[in-house]
């Protein structure tokens, strides 16, 4: 799951950028000031360019979560050209206020609307009920409807590959983890990373600092510097900016990028980045809506689907043994021969949680609320 907290906005009344692309057009408009009462549905696919909309919690920038989604939107434009008109709405806060945006996009004839943050869920459920001829897709959610599907990526697989590298590289045996908010997705990532790092080096300790936000460069810097002060010589993150990488570069230690390739923000510090590729899913979904074959089947892609991978591995900083180990683990996960959450797995207290030979199923992974052995830190109360 993803994006459960509200990114602070200057004002809910502030203008939100909307850019429409396709047919060589590029226009902007403001998000609606109030929820639309219109019940119009999008025109059937095939009658002129199909309207496809993306709702972003932030702006794409040049790295991170929204940037990764934007690359998927660009891939749709490149694939379909003047067969689609792609609209983006940026900086849309989570919660009830986002409903205005989804209703506006649906009433203006978009046939397919992607909501790329967890906190849009209830707004999308309500809007989908009133626009049955529009297809809605919600990233990281779990509520569906006949015209509302959900999709996500197994980021924990990318975190696990990073852990393989981290276990090889650390000299202090302390790895710092800058974490966003304590939801199953993030806990899963921390655990998968730690399992891999300690498989390589059982002495590794993974120290976690929470910032309780997806994007807060100031807090991200404070957390990263605090972890360096605690002896971390490798940093991992589950936050959206590249500040953690920049801190690593300044402190002359190493770090991993998250959601996209962050190597340019710390060329010497960068070990690798766990990067998401949404393009295949977005292209496939657009095609299904165009062809009338779309179904609201939940999708959780990963390494097998080439939707998450460890990219831009720094050959100068990552030893050959680590690179070979990552390649082998990648292939094992891809081929279904390995799952990071296969027992025996012990919790922080040393007690067995997953017995030998058992693999946690997806429902169990979605509800994970505990740290594995080797993690130092606690789960904040919600």
Where are these regions (language model features)?
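C-terminal motif of bacterial Sec signal peptides marking the signal peptidase cleavage site
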Residues: 17-20
């Amino acid at each position: 799951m993803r994006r459960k907290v509200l990114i602070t906005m200057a004002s809910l009344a502030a203008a939100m950028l909307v850019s429409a692309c396709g047919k060589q057009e590029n226009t902007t408009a403001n998000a609606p000031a109030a929820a639309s009462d219109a019940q119009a549905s999008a025109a059937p696919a095939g009658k002129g360019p199909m309207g496809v909309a993306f709702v972003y919690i932030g702006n794409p920038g040049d790295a991170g979560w929204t940037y990764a989604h934007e690359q998927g939107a660009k891939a749709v434009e490149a694939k379909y050209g003047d067969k689609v008109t792609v609209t983006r709405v940026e900086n849309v806060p989570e919660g009830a206020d986002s409903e205005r945006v989804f209703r506006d996009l649906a009433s203006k004839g978009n046939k397919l609307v992607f909501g790329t943050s967890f906190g849009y869920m209830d707004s999308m459920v309500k809007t989908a009920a009133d626009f049955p001829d529009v297809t809605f897709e919600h990233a990281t959610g779990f509520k569906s409807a006949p015209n509302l599907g959900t999709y996500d990526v197994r980021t924990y697989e990318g975190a696990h590959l990073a852990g393989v590298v981290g276990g090889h590289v650390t000299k202090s045996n302390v790895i710092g983890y800058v974490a966003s908010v304590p939801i199953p997705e993030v806990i899963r990532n921390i655990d998968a990373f730690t399992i891999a790092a300690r498989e390589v080096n059982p002495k590794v300790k993974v120290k976690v600092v929470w910032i309780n936000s997806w994007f807060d460069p100031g807090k991200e810097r404070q957390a990263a510097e605090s972890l360096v002060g605690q002896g971390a010589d490798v940093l991992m993150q589950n936050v959206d900016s590249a500040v953690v990488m920049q801190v690593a570069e300044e402190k002359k230690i190493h770090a991993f990028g998250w959601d996209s390739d962050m190597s340019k923000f710390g060329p010497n510090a960068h070990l690798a980045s766990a990067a998401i590729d949404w393009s295949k899913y977005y292209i496939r979904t657009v095609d299904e809506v165009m062809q009338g074959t779309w179904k609201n089947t939940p999708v959780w892609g990963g390494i097998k689907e080439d939707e998450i991978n460890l990219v831009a591995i720094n050959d100068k900083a990552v030893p050959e043994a680590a690179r070979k180990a990552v390649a082998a683990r990648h292939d094992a996960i891809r081929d279904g021969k390995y799952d990071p959450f296969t027992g025996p797995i012990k919790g922080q207290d040393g007690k067995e949680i997953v017995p030998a030979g058992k693999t946690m199923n997806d429902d169990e992974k979605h509800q994970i609320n505990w740290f594995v052995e080797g993690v130092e830190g606690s789960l904040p109360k919600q």
